[in-house]
């Protein structure tokens, strides 16, 4: 559907013919008028593995997770006739064993590049415990080809008190500020502390369109499925599913995610 009054009313767009089975894992509309979609394809059934209780630390149970396996890639499609016909790209997996978009929107920058935040597992050891990392993949030709990738948050090898690579970085959104800076918000879970994980958000800042990142020191506890929206005054509103696992929450930052 299309709206010409700020989303108050909508009209169906006739003649759209999405490729494949019609589902999209990401969708965007470029300033040129080109439409983009990202579609995830699973090349094997997802094996969830299992977890083993390893004992107590400070009165809390600890766990080892292993046996998970998957194989997924992303295909990007673009359309220049408002969705009537589509052209696909070569499948993208980059450095990952499996990869998926971490949000459903693209980022278009002033230099003409387009980026999509993604996450996945890099090594077999990472994949076994679902110790995922995330980053951005770019296109420099209007979405025709993809493959220029940079990590944002990367899981680390097991430490002395870990049973698998830690932590798990999964759901991530990136807000592009008016000054060109990017602020990334990523879900962060310590797998050792439970088979589902304890969610928090780590924040990182990039001043070079996502090439390199530094942590801001900002963090939110007990959140997941976060989305960042840039407000008219330049602040960031971060919406998320709160610790209740049902209630929505929102936090606002005026200092690029530092607080």
Regions found by a protein language model. Give the residues of each.
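Asp-box/BNR beta-propeller blade signature and adjacent active/binding-site loops
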Residues: 1-259
């Amino acid at each position: 559907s299309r709206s010409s009054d700020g989303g108050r009313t909508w009209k169906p767009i006739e003649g759209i013919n999405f490729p494949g089975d019609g589902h999209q894992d990401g969708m965007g509309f470029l300033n040129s008028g080109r439409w983009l979609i990202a579609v995830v394809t699973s090349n094997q059934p997802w094996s969830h593995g299992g977890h083993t209780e390893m004992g107590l630390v400070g009165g809390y149970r600890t766990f080892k997770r292993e046996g998970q396996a998957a194989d997924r890639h992303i295909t990007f499609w673009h359309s220049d006739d408002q969705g009537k016909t589509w052209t696909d790209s070569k499948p993208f997996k980059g450095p990952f064993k499996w990869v998926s978009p971490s949000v459903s929107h693209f980022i278009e920058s002033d230099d003409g590049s387009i980026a999509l935040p993604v996450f996945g597992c890099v090594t077999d050891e990472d994949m076994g415990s679902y110790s995922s990392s995330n980053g951005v993949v770019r296109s420099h030709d209007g979405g025709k080809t993809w493959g220029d990738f940079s990590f944002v948050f990367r899981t680390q090898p097991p430490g002395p008190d870990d049973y698998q690579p830690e932590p798990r970085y999964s759901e991530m959104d990136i807000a592009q500020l008016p000054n060109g800076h990017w602020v990334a918000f990523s879900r962060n879970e310590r797998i050792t502390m439970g088979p589902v994980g304890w969610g928090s958000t780590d924040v990182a800042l990039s001043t070079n369109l996502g090439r390199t990142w530094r942590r801001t020191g900002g963090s939110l506890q007990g959140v997941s499925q976060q989305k960042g929206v840039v407000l008219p005054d330049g602040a960031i509103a971060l919406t998320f599913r709160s610790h209740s696992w049902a209630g929505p929450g929102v936090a606002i930052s005026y200092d690029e995610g530092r607080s």
